[in-house]
Amino acid sequence: MSSWASFIFLFIFSFLTSFRVFAQDPTYRYHSCPNTTIFSRDSAYFSNLQTLLSFLSSPDASSSYSSGFRNDAVGTFPDRVTGLFDCRGDLPPEVCHNCVAFAVKDTLIRCPNERDVTLFYDECTLRYSNLVVTSALDPTYVYHVCPSWATFPRSSTYMTNLITLLSTLSSPSASYSTGFQNATAGKHPDRVTGLFNCRGDVSPEVCRRCVSFAVNETSTRCPIEKEVTLYYDQCTLRYSNRNILSTSNTNGGIILANSQNMTSNEQARFKDLVLTTMNQATIAAANSSKRFDARSANFTTLHSLYTLVQCTHDLTRQDCLSCLQQIINQLPTEKIGGQFIVPSCSSRFELCLFYNQSAVTTPQPQQNSAPPPPPTSIPSPRPGLNSRFPLITCLSAVSFEKFKDLLKPGFICILIKIVSENTGKGGNSSVIIIAVVVSITALLLLFVAVFSVRTKRRKKMIGAIPLLNVKRKDTEVTEPLAENGDSITTAGSLQFDFKAIVAATNNFLPINKLGQGGFGEVYKGTFPSGVQVAVKRLSKTSGQGEREFENEVVVVAKLQHRNLVRLLGYCLEGEEKILVYEFVHNKSLDYFLFDTTMKRQLDWTRRYKIIGGIARGILYLHQDSRLTIIHRDLKAGNILLDADMNPKVADFGMARIFGMDQTEANTRRVVGTYGYMAPEYAMYGQFSMKSDVYSFGVLVFEIISGMKNSSLYQMDDSVSNLVTYTWRLWSNGSQLDLVDPSFGDNYQTHDITRCIHIALLCVQEDVDDRPNMSAIVQMLTTSSIVLAVPKQPGFFFRGRHEQVGEVGSSVDRLALCSIDDASITSVAPR
């Protein structure tokens, strides 16, 4: 071992044996706060909620943090609020307290006005509601679907039959031991059919408790809807006025994904293992009388993959196979865990044990004929339900032949073992693990310092071009790219060699050209490995490109989402400035949407899916990524479609990163595309998340109609842009006239009307009236949410006979400019 290695080893060993406690923010997993019941900040409910959260997070509750659980209630009906926290059983009191305190602060950011809230972290769960939630054994709510197109009055025969049905399903004599029961009550047209299906690994008592809880919640979540599906982690409850028995249904489901990505070099192998194991489980479940299977498979020497699949018992073998195969192919296998739940079947995979292994007969982890590949560094799996899983695991054994070997997981493994032996059986494993994390960080800092010096020397020796910030050459007053001062040197992207890009694109051969914009040209490239990429080459004559180039690298390098285009790297060599993206097989949305022939490939089902995908991508930018990012140039030309017509938001050259507490910003440099710009941005340079919401609303109008917002539309002797035209149709009750004629009769009237309604809420003139993206996604996925009445949109075109109030010339000019479809780089300051 070298002297350097010896020094580092002794330093880490001393650090580990002396270090005791280190606080860190809990790891966020998921939250649920349906906005079907909300409160105002000046209400008695909010006052009671503040008191409750203060009780739950109080440092005085030391005994509760020791036990890991506390529940409480504040106020009287109807403003009574009850809540609880539940910490993971292996955590010390101080970590439990830290998680609860963090969750209490986080809840009013993630769920600012919702009454029924659950926040999940790796270390704890926080829950509160206007309902009774004082039991730690309450089932974990996941999602519900209850379309509002079929409802019943409270005093109807259907209501009586529903009460009878729910009483039967939740009775003490129900079939909880088998985990499934169906029943029917009443006669047509008031017949109601229902069923419950419990997860195959839960006990009869857990099944009974889940079904009973779900039955009680139907009156709150879906009080007057005839067709209802409630999903919980332990069971599903369904009922309808239609026959739902022995019929496969894959509509109205939800995909949940772990926030951590599988490392890129392991994604292909991990996906193959997930699909292989899931397919084996699918066959076993279809052949099982319980229509259930759970099994595991080795991923690395110290990590196993755990999978679970299930169908409702009433499905035939073939229907079960078909249902599971359909949803398995849509699982988010780029993540280290995920699930897809639909009414008739469900599937889930994790890198940690999330089901009751003792309750299922599951095959041993599969052994390959060849030894498993050497383990590589992958994200530490997050614990699932009913599991005890280490936060850090030893991944491989390594030699100390080179200094950099000290960074490999095998060295971490040795250190963990040494410290574990020193602490004895009574040692605190959580403290040890946290100490290891801190020690590794210290080691990384030393490693970076040493190799920075060595790298600089090597670059000087071989004449390599260092990574430099892209500087503007003019003296124009500019705005910062990001509030945290990020630059291209800290983006963390891979820098490509220019010669490799030239070879991949055949020296930028015109036949490989995919398109051209204000930034420059985009080419298709193929590397020797067969990997296809999209190469975006900055035009040397572009006045705006240098700034946008750096901005795009800084922003996109930090993003990972299935509905965002992925940046693979960049190239800086001489005057060449190039971005390398994943190759998206189809072109942009406008290529299909506004072409009379190509638009026929986008039926309503696909367009509805595209709307939802775009919404989820923007939600990730605004809320779910570790940064808050405002796109500022959302339009059909910046939405790419992959081989399956899934949308990917692209072109982040205009994007801005917000600070943690920042909600809006001002700029003198208005960039983007008129027609998609929100009024406050185009006129005053004020932009926020609500600016993107406005652009999203315009985009939805274009997707539904297949028409450009920049065109002019005649109606009642008036000339309108698409936004105003839609508003007039809505006001006249003829909103379906907006629908693209290429659909024919193949569309859902309710879905299209709801999408138009949501889009009108997005384009309202007052910023505060527009919903945020989280609410929009919930509106799109939960038809039971009641929508507000939309107000007049911004940039409203009035008819010649309408009264026009006095407005400034700047507003008049911008209203006319809003029909221009050109990309704008700057306008005169106002």
From Swiss-Prot:
The modification Phosphotyrosine is found at residues 581, 681. Keywords: ATP-binding, Glycoprotein, Kinase, Membrane, Nucleotide-binding, Phosphoprotein, Receptor, Repeat, Serine/threonine-protein kinase, Signal, Transferase, Transmembrane, Transmembrane helix. It catalyses: L-seryl-[protein] + ATP = O-phospho-L-seryl-[protein] + ADP + H(+); L-threonyl-[protein] + ATP = O-phospho-L-threonyl-[protein] + ADP + H(+). Glycans are attached at residues 35, 182, 216, 261, 287, 298, 356, 428. Its EC number is 2.7.11.-. Residues 27-133, 140-244, 250-354 form the Gnk2-homologous domain. Residues 24-430 are extracellular. The chain crosses the membrane at residues 431-451. Induction: By salicylic acid (SA). Residues 452-830 are cytoplasmic. It holds the Pfam family PK_Tyr_Ser-Thr. Residues 370-382 have a biased composition (Pro residues). It comes from the Eukaryota. ATP binds at residues 514-522, 536. Belongs to the protein kinase superfamily. Ser/Thr protein kinase family. CRK subfamily. PANTHER family: CYSTEINE-RICH RECEPTOR-LIKE PROTEIN KINASE 13-RELATED, RECEPTOR-LIKE SERINE/THREONINE-PROTEIN KINASE SD1-8. This is Putative cysteine-rich receptor-like protein kinase 23. It comes from Arabidopsis thaliana (Mouse-ear cress).
